[in-house]
């Protein structure tokens, strides 16, 4: 299940990153303005690409934190307390 969550986070992070990069691109200069419909009634929001950029960076930061936490949890069971040559003491209740 952790692998599927990791894959999902990577896909979401990459798609957000791609969307933010594509949102900043200028339209092609070769396009004929007469072929485009008149969208003068629409008001583009200038803050929308900034929102996507923040969202993408948050997703990437969360993915990196998740990976680092899972790596640290996976290696913590290998740490030994005391001398490795000693037998572990048995705990009785």
From Swiss-Prot:
The keyword Secreted applies. Residues 33-42 have a biased composition (Basic and acidic residues). Residues 1-23 form the signal peptide. GO terms for cellular component: extracellular region. Keywords: Secreted, Signal. Residues 22-47 are annotated as: Disordered. InterPro entries: DUF4576. The keyword Transcription regulation does not apply. It is found in: Secreted. PANTHER family: SIMILAR TO AVLV472. This is Uncharacterized protein C5orf46 homolog.
